[in-house]
């Protein structure tokens, strides 16, 4: 920019007033080279002497530089880009005094960086520091007193040969200049390190049983870590490396104390982990809990695609990769130059910060479109939004949580992510079947002890005990049974339940699942996840259902995600099995248990007798026999047909189950006479309640009159006693005789008075032991009071 300078019109100027004229190399180098008889000459090596001789020879015949007159570089000033030389010294050329007073054109005054490295005059323009000590008087006047003293000290050191020069740099190349006592301190330090290494490599010796650690002193973590490695090595080959007289329990006890000290765990949780993992895997698990898990994102496919989201975040300075082949929407973040939870994409709802293990339960649930799904413990809403994402905002999702404060985060996340098919509720999950049920699928992320997320919450290491584990397990059992009751087994597309926890203890996982298999009509099905370790079917003294192999466990040291447990159930019946199978309504329809079926008891609480069982069996046989064209009706325990006379059903059944055969033909004749008299009476009477059912306080001669008539369903389910087999033939014969007598027309049967019913030898209730015995007096009185009404008008 600006006007171009015309070099022809530039005035020529000579050297400055303070410019120092540099003398030849023969005078400049003499000051630094020692004299021939000087003692300091012995300090120079052979190579240094050769280089000094070359300088002396070169300083005698120095060719005159081919340089334009008038150019002179001021000492103490360097052109832009030039570096003052510290290595090899080059003798300055002898300058002509006549040329010092002449000056070249303006273009020659400018020295570029390319001229310094590529031009032939670069050595001539370079300023050396050989004459730094011989400053002019004007320069010394500008220096401070302390600077003058420093210059004098430097000059004295130069004369003594201590000044830095290139000969000092060549001492490492010479073998003659190294003294044997050059590095005494380094040798001592190396010897000390070697001694420490020798001490560390000593064999591990288990301390005596009664000896304890020194109180009041902080443990040396390096020694503790070394001892842990030694104990693990001994336990791997215990038979060969153990000390004589020491048991495995002593080594394990010492290892537990060292692990608790080194990793800051409580004794209870560490003992649980030692029961769960082998020793080598235990160390890996403890080390993995000291490192945080990688940050993972879940793409919200309701608003964007994973490819587009990844490109936007990469442009913002986020280093990320796809989460894995098992996930189509996950991204893992390695590092970021922007806060990953405050980007415009996050605020717009394009992604959700969610752990990798939290995506697995929703993938195992596999929700379908247009379904009714329940998320029983939904806060903070990550799994709920993922379910809505897979359902494409169709169907209905009921998101429930017992903590009202945590529901605020659920509302915020669902609004931000654009979820529109979710209803939020605040109920206790244990009472949820009373609120609403009939869901196609249910997801239960039960509250747990959090032993799988120690990297997020290190306080779990010390603040958990046996009571906390048992309390969580009891709550999980209640929630799981409630969730199973909320599932509809008759769903065409569903009937599934996924149970998951962020804990790795057996008490909160396999134990709870095995309990649910015994209490409800469910079975375990595969989760559909291609990776993960199988659940335990046996753990120490416990034995679980073999189908627990289909459950999945995830650990931080093997899968690089939070510890998790996932189980998937399929409900095949909405009924609830009971421990006592007496209730027919609660019995399982698929597998009815008839062996434990109990016959109904009598009203007075006594056990049913053989005769009562025979009566039930006879009634069952009567129901199976083909009846006549005219149907029979049952009213108040009396089977009647229109225009026909009948007798009470229970006494007939009792008569048919007589164990003896002494009556013979006499019983048949008495029956015929009795039936003929009943035909002549006309309208039938209805016995009162007092006559039908005797009071418990007044014992009746009719022993089985108080036995209630069982229902048809109970009759079908009742077992057949073996002792009633011979009496069934008699019952069939007598029943046929009754039907033949009943089919005879009743001509001229005049109705009698009600009082006449109690009189006469043929009473409606007959004792099973004697067919001619009259009824008791109390029953006769109750029947004559006029309470009974005729059955036929």
Swiss-Prot record:
Q: Which residues carry this modification: Phosphothreonine?
A: 169
Q: Where is this region: C-terminal domain?
A: 580-793
What does the UniProt keyword field contain?
Acetylation, Citrullination, Isopeptide bond, Methyltransferase, Nucleus, Phosphoprotein, Ribosome biogenesis, RNA-binding, rRNA processing, S-adenosyl-L-methionine, Transferase, Ubl conjugation
Q: Which Pfam families match?
A: Methyltr_RsmB-F, NOP2_rpt, RsmF-B_ferredox
| InterPro entries, per the entry | MeTrfase_RsmB-F_NOP2_cat, MeTrfase_RsmB-F_NOP2_dom, NOP2_rpt, Nop2p, RCMT, RCMT_NOP2, RsmB-like_ferredoxin, RsmB/NOL1/NOP2-like_CS
Q: Where is this cross-link: Glycyl lysine isopeptide (Lys-Gly) (interchain with G-Cter in SUMO2)?
A: 72, 257, 601
Which EC number(s) are documented for this chain? 2.1.1.-
**Known catalytic reactions:** a cytidine in 28S rRNA + S-adenosyl-L-methionine = a 5-methylcytidine in 28S rRNA + S-adenosyl-L-homocysteine + H(+)
**Which of the seven top EC classes does this enzyme belong to?**
transferase
Record-annotated active site? 502
Q: Where is this region: Disordered?
A: 1-194, 576-793
Name any GO cellular component annotation.
Answer: nucleolus
Give me the ranges of the annotated region N-terminal domain: 1-355
- Motif residue range(s): Nucleolar localization signal: 41-58
Record's compositionally biased regions (Basic and acidic residues)? 182-192
Task: List residues binding S-adenosyl-L-methionine.
Answer: 377-383, 401, 428, 445
Give an example GO molecular function: rRNA (cytosine-C5-)-methyltransferase activity
Report biased composition (Polar residues) as residue ranges.
599-609, 654-668, 784-793
Q: Cross-referenced PROSITE patterns, in alphabetical order?
A: NOL1_NOP2_SUN, SAM_MT_RSMB_NOP
Organism domain of life = Eukaryota
Where in the sequence does UniProt note compositional bias of the Acidic residues kind? Answer: 98-110, 118-128, 165-178
> PANTHER family, alphabetically?
28S RRNA (CYTOSINE(4447)-C(5))-METHYLTRANSFERASE-RELATED, NOP2 YEAST -RELATED NOL1/NOP2/FMU SUN DOMAIN-CONTAINING
Q: Which protein family is it in?
A: Belongs to the class I-like SAM-binding methyltransferase superfamily. RsmB/NOP family.
How it assembles, according to the record, is:
Interacts with MCRS1. Interacts with WDR46. Interacts with RRP1B. Interacts with NPM1, NOP56, FBL, RUVBL1 and NUFIP1.
What is the name attached to this protein's record? Answer: 28S rRNA (cytosine-C(5))-methyltransferase
Which species is this UniProt entry from? Mus musculus (Mouse)
